[in-house]
Swiss-Prot record:
Cofactor(s) needed: heme b
Transmembrane segments: 47-67, 98-118, 131-151, 166-186, 194-214, 247-267, 306-326, 341-361, 368-388
Record text on subunit structure and interactions: The main subunits of complex b-c1 are: cytochrome b, cytochrome c1 and the Rieske protein.
Location(s), subcellular: Cell membrane
Entry's Gene Ontology BP terms: respiratory electron transport chain
Cited InterPro entries: Cyt_b/b6_C, Cyt_b/b6_C_sf, Cyt_b/b6_N, Cytb/b6-like_sf, Cytochrome_b, Cytochrome_b_C_euk/bac, Cytochrome_b_N_euk/bac, Di-haem_cyt_TM
This protein's encoding gene: petB
UniProt record similarity statement: Belongs to the cytochrome b family.
Matches recorded under Gene3D superfamilies: Cytochrome Bc1 Complex, Chain C (1.20.810.10)
Pfam family, one: Cytochrom_B_C
Cofactor note: Binds 2 heme b groups non-covalently.
Keyword match Cell membrane: yes
Name assigned to this protein: Cytochrome b
GO cellular component terms given for this protein: plasma membrane; respiratory chain complex III
Amino acid sequence: MSDNITPKTGKTNAIIEWIDYRLPVFSFLKHFSHYQTPKNLSYLWNLGSIAGIALVIQIITGVILAMHYTPHVDHAFDSVEKIMRNVNYGWLLRYTHAVGASMFFAAVYLHIARGLYYGSYKAPRELLWHIGIIIFLTMMATAFMGYVLPWGQMSYWGATVITNLFSAIPLIGKSIVTWLWGGFSVDNPTLNRFFSLHYLLPFIIVALVMLHLVALHQHGSNNPKGIDVKSPKDTIPFHPYYTVKDFVGFGVYFIIFAYFIFYEPNYLGHPDNYIPANPLVTPAHIVPEWYFLPFYAILRAVPSKLGGVLLMFGSIFVLFLLPWLDTSKVRSANYRPIYRIAFWIFMADCLLLGYLGGQPAEEPYITISRFAACYYFFHFLVALPLIGKYEKPLPLPEEL
């Protein structure tokens, strides 16, 4: 019997070698399993893998939902309700996709916060950081278009408000808005193109994630101490050590995910989106999804439409400049006492902006939003360069 098994194994190996010589997919997988990683990574380094799992879930559920969705203003709302009532486990698919978007953004926001704290944007990882911010921007575009598809009141008026922002561009703004709408108002052509782009953009995100991984593997992961790996004893193979650690993170992630799907599926949404879109009735309070609220607060903080648009886009663009705005040679905030305080003040400011973005556009929220928006830019444009110049960091360790 053992004589029968041995040739079969050899034949299998020969086939694998033949394929791998022409298409090195098995060598690629082997590289991942033997990839050397800093030995002191904490659970915060699980967030990249968790975001990857969230992206896969969004693509799978999105493709299946698209099979039952009708991108037409007369049928979109009803098709979503049909998915909820008549499609087998349609309610589960829709809630998984809707909650999954929030979970995806939560993982990415924590991933970005970890990068800010440990200086993962510093040399030689500038391009790694830039690709990550491009992924974040693409996610925002995808999520916005997806929010329009149910064609409820918030969907319609959210699309109207956000697309109208482009009208603030001098000379060509109105033409751009008409081009985006495919007509003179948000209507069927708008819904069709948003559906098409919402289907396309996740696959562009996958391509960007591949680039992100290539950039990551070029210089390896940063670590909590923020120092470079100096010897092989500072590293361990990614598998099995960090794959096991990732599975622990996945377990926690899916417990939280399942809680929202089965117990609070609409907690992060807005009840007005269960009302069919009506161009003649404006909601009392137009609110975007929670993950857009800090930027929405910055947009509303400025009376001028053009000024608000510039600040809103500037609040994201400033992240591209971060590798050069932070002048400190030390990466990790663990060894930067002043920056560590500034970081947590900045985190509190972002949470405050998120809260203010969900409040009505009235006093005192507008005034507080202006102060919070000012501090947001102060942190990047003033505090970081000055802290890096004058801060005295703690002594760095010699090894991990």
